[in-house]
Amino acid sequence: MLVILGGLPGTGKTTIAREFARALEAIHIRIDTIEQAIRNSSLAPAEVNEAGYLVAFALAEDNLRLGRTVIADSVNPIELTRAAWREVANRAGTSFTEVELICSDIEEHRRRVETRAADIDGFKLPTWEEVVARDYEPWTEDHVVVDTAALTPDQALANLCAIFSSPHEGEGGTRAEGIGGEGRL
């Protein structure tokens, strides 16, 4: 199974993805780590976004074909990349679930962005102004929405684990709908 995780910087993606990967004994593939490794290489292209996603797609597909669950951790700002992740799952013959993390409390979101520290050597975190100005297309496919403003990381993790342990999860590439019938946690 592929968990396609996305959301703006500062919504808690990596914090939740790491713990979710531990809980599911899954592979955690983080775009920021891949892109920074490319930047650090002697062959670093000026624009690493495409290369980072292509590497992540390949790593995810390899692991999915081994029967592993993969958590894909990226901003995933446009439908093009979301569709590409879905295609990775389809090629590997496995199910996928799309999960968007949001932080509906603007002040809390800003506080997180402005106070967090990078955990990847050389990685430059975006400023609040860069987060707000970022192109981010609305999600159009069925997906789970996790509002991290209203949940602690442990609560978000517990809710995700409950969804992924439900009997309907992962049937034929369907997406989970979340709690409350609206796909929102």
Give the label of every model feature segment.
Residues L8:
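P-loop (Walker A) phosphate-binding loop of NTP-binding proteins
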Residues G170-E171, E177-G178:
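Glycine-biased, low-complexity coil/linker segments
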Residues T11, T15-L66:
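Conserved substrate/cofactor phosphate-moiety recognition/catalytic segment
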Residues L2:
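Walker A (P-loop) ATP-phosphate-binding motif of ABC ATPase nucleotide-binding domains
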Residues A92-R112, V146:
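Conserved phosphate-donor/acceptor-positioning beta-strand/loop module used by diverse small-molecule
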Residues A51-F96:
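Glycine-rich phosphate-binding loop used to anchor ATP phosphates in small-molecule kinases
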Residues L5:
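Hydrophobic anchor at the beta1->P-loop junction of P-loop NTPases
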Residues T115-L157:
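Small-molecule kinase domains that catalyze NTP-dependent phosphoryl transfer to phosphate-bearing small molecules
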